[in-house]
Amino acid sequence: MKKLIVTVLTSVFLAGCSTYQKNADIPIIDTHIHLYDTTRPEGLPWPPKDDEVLYRPVLTEHFDKVSDENGINATVIVEASKWIPDNQWVLDLVKHDPNRYIGLVGSLEIGTPDFKKHLTKLSKDGRFVGIRMRERPGGDSFFENEAVWSDLQLLSDRNQTLDVLMFQYSLDDVDMISKRLPKLKILINHVAGADIEGKPADPKWIAAVQKAAKNSNVNCKISGLFQQSHRQPSPRNLSFYQSELDVLWEAFGEDRLIYGSNWPVTMRGGTYGEYLAVVKGFFADKSRAAREKFFFKNALKFYGLPALKH
């Protein structure tokens, strides 16, 4: 009996190792991390002070360690602060290591008089690749503001990118934007806002994903899996997330899925290594070409970034 248990455990261990070894020589770009400093004299708008997990300094030295431990070659930072100067603050913070910190998805309020001015200024730095829509001023009337569409058109004209957080926006919003601006590069964050419960995916969500994915300019990040789980602490087994991941794979295919973590928010659900293991597990049976696209090539193409430097 003891020998049987040892054999089973060894098999499980080797299976896990084989997944990592299969990806060991494939570079990884994490397209979704946040950096901030809670000790700044001016403070910061996010995370809130009562967040026991996130309210602490999260700086390059912290991600460097995570990155080195997990084989992450480079990263794209997503600005979570709504304060405009914080875009430049992050660019300055990471300028010492341009090979690791290769891009910034900024935070600028679309539909405001100074949007173009701020976008133009920040874009002088080639690492500033685009912006993320996070908050929705005006609520349901947001898209009735023609200035919103002018700013989105500007992004498209400049070949810059639009990340969309599925919090105050919907997949129907993404579908509408992509149809009106078919050349705008759009990236849906956090597994398209899936509510993951470890059972077959919600049919309404599936239909919305399929509708949005019909637009060739729409892409999706496999990010924030642990945060989208209704069960906490987040399950570490791939089977819990399988249904939603299968839907996204079928809808977007190997050319329009991109890897991201949502670190340090991932720490609410587990370690970075545990998160990465789930994602790698899903792609373990995919072709090498598909894994290369997902883990780094699609990110370079979408964000318009230069080839990785080793």
Predicted feature locations:
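Histidine-centered divalent metal-coordination motifs
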Residues: 32-36, 190
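Divalent metal-dependent hydrolysis catalytic cores, especially in the metallo-beta-lactamase
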Residues: 47-82, 101-109, 129-136, 162
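Sec-dependent signal peptide recognition
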Residues: 2-8
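Active-site glycine-centered loops adjacent to acidic/histidine catalytic or metal-binding residues
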Residues: 262
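C-terminal motif of bacterial Sec signal peptides marking the signal peptidase cleavage site
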Residues: 15-16
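Mid-to-C-terminal alpha-helical segments outside catalytic/metal-binding sites
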Residues: 4, 19-21, 26-31, 56-74, ...
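Active-site gating/metal-coordination segments in enzymes
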Residues: 84-169, 176-179, 221, 225, ...
